[in-house]
């Protein structure tokens, strides 16, 4: 079904381009006669109908503006796709690395939690000493 819709769209685009060429020929070779004016009006009406038909059969595909800019600059849109995929690959590798580090650190923390007990009261006491005497050096035994 998608291929048939694509083919219909291509055929309609070809017809529209042919109509535009005919209009340009009529405008270029205009003599100002009534027959020429009527022919031009008829071709313009045909063009409007063809644009309406294009609007009816258009594809509902979202095209990134960057791809359109690439095409406007005469560049190959496949280059944009390749660069975008490479960027996503780098980001994916970075996030995967972060996840690996988190998994390893979680495993290390779990394996050492039984061996190294946390002394919360010692840590809280040290923090109050530091905050109450900010100008003095901390004294005491470090265990």
UniProtKB/Swiss-Prot annotation:
<protein>
    <recommendedName>
        <fullName>Mediator of RNA polymerase II transcription subunit 10</fullName>
    </recommendedName>
</protein>
<dbReference type="Pfam" id="PF09748">
    <property type="entry name" value="Med10"/>
</dbReference>
<keyword id="KW-0804">Transcription</keyword>
<dbReference type="InterPro" id="IPR019145">
    <property type="entry name" value="Mediator_Med10"/>
</dbReference>
<dbReference type="GO" id="GO:0006357">
    <property type="term" value="P:regulation of transcription by RNA polymerase II"/>
</dbReference>
<keyword id="KW-0539">Nucleus</keyword>
<dbReference type="GO" id="GO:0016592">
    <property type="term" value="C:mediator complex"/>
</dbReference>
<comment type="subunit">
    <text>Component of the Mediator complex.</text>
</comment>
<feature type="compositionally biased region" description="Polar residues">
    <location>
        <begin position="124"/>
        <end position="143"/>
    </location>
</feature>
<feature type="region of interest" description="Disordered">
    <location>
        <begin position="123"/>
        <end position="143"/>
    </location>
</feature>
<dbReference type="GO" id="GO:0003712">
    <property type="term" value="F:transcription coregulator activity"/>
</dbReference>
<keyword id="KW-0010">Activator</keyword>
<comment type="similarity">
    <text>Belongs to the Mediator complex subunit 10 family.</text>
</comment>
<keyword id="KW-0805">Transcription regulation</keyword>
<comment type="function">
    <text>Component of the Mediator complex, a coactivator involved in the regulated transcription of nearly all RNA polymerase II-dependent genes. Mediator functions as a bridge to convey information from gene-specific regulatory proteins to the basal RNA polymerase II transcription machinery. Mediator is recruited to promoters by direct interactions with regulatory proteins and serves as a scaffold for the assembly of a functional preinitiation complex with RNA polymerase II and the general transcription factors.</text>
</comment>
